[in-house]
Design a protein with these regions (language model features):
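Mixed-charge, low-complexity intrinsically disordered regions
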Residues: 11-13, 23
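Domain-level detector of nuclease and nuclease-like folds
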Residues: 93-287
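C-terminal motif of bacterial Sec signal peptides marking the signal peptidase cleavage site
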Residues: 16-19
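N-terminal, intrinsically disordered, polar/charged segments of Gram-positive cell-envelope systems
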Residues: 24-95
């Protein structure tokens, strides 16, 4: 039972108390002061339950990973492979389980994904890629008109995604689609291939310049560690948006193993060499 359900039950109980009859079922006379005491207790229960509901709403509100001061601080010379290790992981181990959790906000943006990565999840995913579920395109994927409506071509939605050529910091040329449906919890770690476990991320955000950067840096590190040790890894991922933008500026990954061998907080930038991204709607232009 989740916190919201529990809070609703408490609220219902409080309301029920205030509606109780004044005469005991056996016919005993009511005791002076009891009615007032019940009212006071009911009010207290009601206020506590209301606070719990508000706490739940605040915890899952659209502003959790969104503010007006988000900056990617991306410097290609410093972080050519699209990631930066910020320090040790910030993990609250008490909220983790082997059942992965995903969330989204009222702008339909993916907000968090977390879970306890274990050996079974990694081995069950080894050697294959899960197909994406229907309608798994994240916020910022579809082209929008001036009114914020998805652009249609006949009966089909028009995607922001296009095939491009990107000159990587290594000097090599990447030829392919600009965006990926970039997993928060990778499918190689048992993550689900659906809308609220992916963001609209550039190819470089997903795998860096040569397959070992971007999100792939920490994903591969965790996967290899779990395969070798069979230990668990606490893993949480949060994309960060500026205001009401639909595409995240960057993603923060926290990963901490049981034994502390892996203990990192990683910032993964959502940029593309030589291109300017409009994070508000997912469109992009060549510089």
């Amino acid at each position: 039972m989740n916190k919201l359900t529990k809070s609703i039950i408490i609220l219902a109980g409080a309301i029920a108390l205030t509606g109780c009859g004044q005469i005991h079922p056996t016919g005993y006379q009511k005791i002076p002061g009891v009615k007032q005491e019940i009212k006071e207790k009911s009010k207290s229960l009601y206020e506590k339950a209301k606070d719990k509901v508000n706490d739940f709403k605040n915890e899952h509100s659209a502003s959790s990973n969104s503010n007006n001061d988000v900056e990617s601080d991306y410097d290609e010379a410093k972080f050519p492979n699209m990631y930066q290790v910020l320090g040790e992981a910030e993990i609250d181990e008490s909220k983790f389980s082997t059942t992965y959790s995903y969330s989204y906000d009222d702008l339909d943006r993916t907000t968090t994904a977390y879970g306890l990565i274990n050996y079974k999840a990694v081995m069950d995913s080894k050697g294959w890629r899960a197909e994406f579920e229907p309608n798994s395109e994240p916020s910022g994927w579809w082209k929008l008109d001036s009114n914020g409506k998805i652009v249609m071509k006949g009966k089909k939605r028009v995607s922001n995604n296009e095939e491009v050529k990107v000159k990587l910091p290594t000097g090599k040329i990447y030829s392919g689609y600009f965006y990926n449906r970039s997993h928060l919890i990778a499918d190689s770690l048992g993550g689900r291939s659906y809308k609220y476990n992916v963001v609209t991320g550039t190819r470089q955000q997903n795998v860096g310049n040569n397959g070992d950067g971007g999100m792939q840096y920490i994903e591969k590190k965790v996967k290899d560690y779990v395969e070798q040790t069979k230990n668990n890894v606490y893993y949480s991922v949060e994309p960060y948006y500026e205001g009401n933008e639909l595409v995240p500026r960057y993603v923060i990954v926290n990963a901490k193993s049981d034994d502390g061998v892996i203990n990192e907080k990683v910032k993964v930038f959502n940029n593309a060499s030589g291109y300017e991204i409009n994070y508000s709607d997912g469109s992009f232009t060549k510089k």
